């Protein structure tokens, strides 16, 4: 029980700004087991967003609430995944060789491609969530972050790391397939309960496809994955899920 709590708190500490203030075991096996809790952390974030939406929907118009929810997400996650998307776009669209791309991705400064990617990411999230709320799919506020984290887990099934050292290496190739498939089954079952089978399976297939295409792009550009590409995967997974859900 103590080890389970350790791994759960480790995921909260690693992926959010929620203060844990505990000396936690941070071995590779802790992250391997803790992967089970990544969608749980996403559920906590999405659940908090949904509660904010419910609390404000009778006082503010939906478009204003969605802006506040996006701001809340950026604050509670520290913009971790959005930063990964920006760094990935800066590197990949620089059209340089592998070593130079990785150097660009490690640079703390944001470039033009990263800026454009963030603007598009935020605009799409805003418009898609706003449209889905008007359509009666406010549960997407909760489900999108979870599906995004699920896509990270699937990407991490690869053992191809682009760097010898990096924060992403503690996850890449360090995933348990049974854990991933178990938590995915639970998430899809819950999504089916709220959205129906068709509105669950079709967007999820789209997310898996985008995840695989990103994986192929990473192999082509830097011969593997980094922590930044995992963050980019989350953002692309969320956008893909919301976009297809709105379309069907």
Swiss-Prot record:
Keyword Coiled coil assigned: no
Pathway participation: Cofactor biosynthesis; adenosylcobalamin biosynthesis; adenosylcobalamin from cob(II)yrinate a,c-diamide: step 7/7
Pfam families assigned to the protein according to its UniProt record, in alphabetical order: CobS (PF02654)
The keyword Transmembrane helix is annotated on this UniProt entry: yes
Main location as per UniProt: membrane
Membrane-spanning intervals of the chain: 36-56, 59-79, 114-134, 137-157, 170-190, 199-219
HAMAP family given in the database record: CobS (MF_00719)
Role: Joins adenosylcobinamide-GDP and alpha-ribazole to generate adenosylcobalamin (Ado-cobalamin). Also synthesizes adenosylcobalamin 5'-phosphate from adenosylcobinamide-GDP and alpha-ribazole 5'-phosphate.
Protein name: Adenosylcobinamide-GDP ribazoletransferase
Organism field: Clostridium botulinum (strain Okra / Type B1)
Origin organism lineage: Bacteria, Bacillati, Bacillota, Clostridia, Eubacteriales
Name of encoding gene: cobS
């Amino acid at each position: 029980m103590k080890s389970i709590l350790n791994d759960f708190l480790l995921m909260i500490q690693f992926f959010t700004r929620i203060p844990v203030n505990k000396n936690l075991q941070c071995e590779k096996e802790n992250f391997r087991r803790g992967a089970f809790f990544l969608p749980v952390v996403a559920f906590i974030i999405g659940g908090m967003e949904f509660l904010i939406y419910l609390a404000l929907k009778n006082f503010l118009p939906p478009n204003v609430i969605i802006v506040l929810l996006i701001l809340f997400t950026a604050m509670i996650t520290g913009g971790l995944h959005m930063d990964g998307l920006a760094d990935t776009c800066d590197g990949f669209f620089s059209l340089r060789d592998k070593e130079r791309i990785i150097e660009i991705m490690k640079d703390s400064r944001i470039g033009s491609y990263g800026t454009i990617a963030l603007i598009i990411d935020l605009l799409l999230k805003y418009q898609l969530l706003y449209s889905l709320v008007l359509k009666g799919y406010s549960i997407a506020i909760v489900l999108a972050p979870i599906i995004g984290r699920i896509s990270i887990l699937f990407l991490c099934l690869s053992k191809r790391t682009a760097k010898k050292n990096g924060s992403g290496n503690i996850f890449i190739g360090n995933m348990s397939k049974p854990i991933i498939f178990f938590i995915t089954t639970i998430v899809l079952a819950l999504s089916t309960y709220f959205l129906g089978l068709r509105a669950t399976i079709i967007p999820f297939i789209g997310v898996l496809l985008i995840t695989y295409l990103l994986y192929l792009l990473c192999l082509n550009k830097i011969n593997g994955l980094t922590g930044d590409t995992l963050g980019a995967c989350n953002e692309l997974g969320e956008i893909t899920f919301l976009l297809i859900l709105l379309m069907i």
